[in-house]
Amino acid sequence: MLDKTTIDGQEDIVTHPVPKRLLNSAECPTPHVNSLEQYKSMWKESVEQPEKFFGNLGRELLSWSKPFETVQYGSFEAGDVAWFLEGELNASYNCVDRHAFKNPDKIAIIHEGDEPDQVRRITYGELLREVCRMANVLKGLGVRKGDPVAIYMPMIPETIVAILACARIGAIHSVVFAGFSAEILRDRVVDCATRVVLTSDEGRRGGKNIATKCIVDEALRDYENHSVEHVLVFRRTGSPVPWVQGRDVWWHEEMAKARTFCSPEPMSAEDPLFLLYTSGSTGTPKGILHTTGGYLLGVAATVKYIFDYQENDIYACMADIGWVTGHSYIVYGPLTLGATTVLFESTPTYPNPSRFWQLIEKHKITQFYTAPTAIRALQRLGDQWLDNIDMSSLRVLGSVGEPINREAWDWYNEKVGKGRCAVVDTYWQTETGSIIVSPLPGATPTKPGSATLPFFGIDPVLLDPTTGKELTATGQTGVLAIRKPRPSMARSVYNNHSRFVETYLKPYPGYYFTGDGALRDDDGYIWIRGRVDDVINVSGHRLSTSEIESALVNHEAVAESAVVGAHDDLTGQCIHAFVSLKPHIQIADGLEKVLTLQVRKTIGPFAAPRRIYIVSDHPKTRSGKIMRRILRKIVNGEHDQLGDISTLADPSIVAVLINKVQRLNTEANIYI
């Protein structure tokens, strides 16, 4: 009999035990952590004796050119956290050299291009030579230790080469997602004052060419006071592109002239490794700064334990390198451990919705990591796309980016994993650098919708948002904060440390403020409730949008929902919900009323939406995130303040939604 948990009045949330196959099968290696008791013992040591725990882990997983002596220094209160003082290492050496020396013919990168037959396999020996060449090219362009380098490139191996070449010479890479507009790219280039931009002639995605070089040109042309002196261009498609003499240089020409050896620069553990600008923010760009030693240890440890990486595994993360998930779980995490990492250039549905599943079968992938949005989208397209595809190589299925709803979790577990794989619903942020709450495949019973238990070194607390006091009783929802520093957490905002302190350390002194709300259940499992600023105040009731969205998605007809607040003269705000339906579900008369009653029943009458819009899709970024900011502007009539929508997967959906909202708001029978 499976245990059940009651959350939000739902009494049928099943606790899934660790799959027996992972613990008692000759086909699976023994997990690194193979019992809940072992996890609890390791976690206890990691928070009570962090110097001992992370000192040992740092020596085990990383190679140091100069040993560290002081494991941890500083505090959240002082805003001066540092790890592995006196120690020196190089991220490129840890990701490439040491594996190339040991096993040069092992595959480091499997690149599956936009077309399924475009597959490249790059060994660690080959990767070392390419990284050294690019490092020498960057030196030839005047890049030195501590200089920022902007990278605006598609999902190709050369992007990884560029990242590791920067790390090799001590340059600070700033990767900008290659779907961002020229305006956003310009903001980031100006903020970090880079002199060198790396790009490609074009990118490829979903059967379409993407004009990356033209976007770079536009970003630099529209702002004459930028600092850029060189644009290095990789030839991806061979299409003709505009050329600025004296500034633009061809990648292949410079690489042909470069030596195949470049000594790695010794870096202090606290030297900057990269900047990553948070997406969707307004105002001045916020460049999150990660340092070398702590970050590298965090991503290596989470790949080892959360994805249970074993020798000869094939690890696949479907994120874009332009996001932190790509940095941590395509590049640095797997390569630090000497893994084979899969780099995927296309989309889940090109040329058909079997693409992900065929990818798993073709490359015999053992760990697969993607977003709930992708899972839900593929679920909506039907199970037939998984037919006759052998995915028996899988051991771990990962979810990232947002809490995964129960129905999607069940489908992922049963249809993709066949009930034989661990499902790890991971919670973390750009600022944390690596996963901070997650199950461990061989140790943690799982509950659909819960990220479960904290990873090593993470001491989570729930705080009363008004008083800042810790909430210790189970079943309470509060602000999620972290009590103690951890190696991989960001150290600052680039050139603006006071902003870092004000945003993350000052709201609740002595804690790191995640900005998310969470609930802890009777088993100590953590349920992420969404951003605490995603709160709607209706007649004095503070309502979490994620809770209302969960109530809507629990209806059998609903695939996805997004809830935002609209101004109301009487109640302050009212609730508007955008709902998309599952395939083959017909819009029935009275469905809005049924969904409203569902919310009233799940949360209460005060949470009932004022408007429910049945829509074909939501405005989403190319990484699958629903842009609620845009929906908020639409329902409040601020159509002239939408900002840049070029990053959306389908910008045309915005006009469709505006028309629908305007039309329904003028009809007498819009709301039941």
From Swiss-Prot:
Gene3D superfamilies: 3.30.300.30, N-terminal domain of ligase-like (3.40.50.12780). ATP binds at residues 401-403, 425-430, 516, 531, 542. Its EC number is 6.2.1.1. Belongs to the ATP-dependent AMP-binding enzyme family. PANTHER family: ACETYL-COENZYME A SYNTHETASE, ACETYL-COENZYME A SYNTHETASE 1. Induction: By acetate. The keyword Cell membrane does not apply. One of its GO terms (biological process) is acetyl-CoA biosynthetic process from acetate. It catalyses: acetate + ATP + CoA = acetyl-CoA + AMP + diphosphate. NCBIfam families: Ac_CoA_lig_AcsA, PRK00174.1. InterPro entries: Ac_CoA_lig (IPR011904), ACAS_N (IPR032387), AMP-bd_C (IPR025110), AMP-bd_C_sf (IPR045851), AMP-binding_CS (IPR020845), AMP-dep_synth/lig_dom (IPR000873), ANL_N_sf (IPR042099). PROSITE patterns: AMP_BINDING. GO terms for molecular function: acetate-CoA ligase activity; AMP binding; ATP binding. It comes from the Eukaryota. The lineage of its organism: Eukaryota, Fungi, Fungi incertae sedis, Mucoromycota, Mucoromycotina. CoA binds at residues 205-208, 325, 539, 600. Coiled coil: none annotated. One of its GO terms (cellular component) is cytosol. This is Acetyl-coenzyme A synthetase. Keywords: ATP-binding, Ligase, Nucleotide-binding. The keyword Nucleotide-binding applies. The gene is facA. It comes from Phycomyces blakesleeanus (strain ATCC 8743b / DSM 1359 / FGSC 10004 / NBRC 33097 / NRRL 1555).
